[in-house]
Amino acid sequence: MSGAFGQLVMYLAQQIEAGATLVAILLTIILPFLPESLVEQPEKIMIVVGFAGQGLFAMRFIIQWLSSEKQARSVIPIAFWYFSIGGGSVLFLYAIWRQDLVFMSGQGLGLFIYLRNLYFVRRSRAFTVSEGD
């Protein structure tokens, strides 16, 4: 990546890594059994962050599956969109840290879609409530 966008991504990646270092410092203070080398290797924290984001993202399918089983039909509960946004946001930060344009593009577009769908759900519920008055 080059130009202003590349510089912005690099700056954001450095800030995310600084945050990971801070988290590592706090973890080694709170959990003294953790190795001190964790502070010098923020990429280990970021790998955990990446897996956490992937876990949040995967939960949306489990929630959708359980809701569909409960109702004996295919449904997408509102929690699906919240987990999509949570997991997508964490994975987007992880993609910025990795400076991976393909990953950033996919997660960025996904976040837009999840937020838009949540907007439609909220608007539909507000419309249904106001219609019932």
Label each residue range with its predicted role.
Residues 1-133:
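Alpha-helical membrane-protein topology signature
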